[in-house]
């Protein structure tokens, strides 16, 4: 079964699929505009499985397509967006909040295993 099918219904969902040492591997599906945020203590990696992610930075936008990846350096403010949606694998250290340094209605307190 496709792990993405186990995620909650909706435009935004995250699920934990693996841990390695102090890192978590998560799957994410997203459509729309996320919030501006940063991760002050860690880099963040997105590997796009399906669709297109537009990573917004204050000085530019980077389009990341299926089969491509992007690493967001620690401390860099960014805002993911996707008009038609994307599915991705997200790699970051264990316990990193999904909204980084910002609390919002998009913050997920505990990401569940799928």
What is the predicted role of each segment?
Residues 21, 49-50, 65-66, 84:
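A cytosolic small-molecule/anion-sensing beta-strand core signal
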Residues 29-30, 39-56, 91:
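Short, conserved beta-strand element in jelly-roll/cupin
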Residues 58-74:
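Short acidic-glycine-tyrosine-enriched beta hairpin
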Residues 10-11, 24-40:
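Conserved short histidine dyad/triad with adjacent acidic residue
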Residues 1-26, 105-114:
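A short, N-terminal "cap"/entry segment at the start of jelly-roll beta-barrel domains
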Residues 22-24, 31-33, 52-54, 61, ...:
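Short, charged/polar surface micro-motifs in flexible loops or helix N-caps
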Residues 74-102:
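Ligand-binding loop in jelly-roll beta-barrel domains
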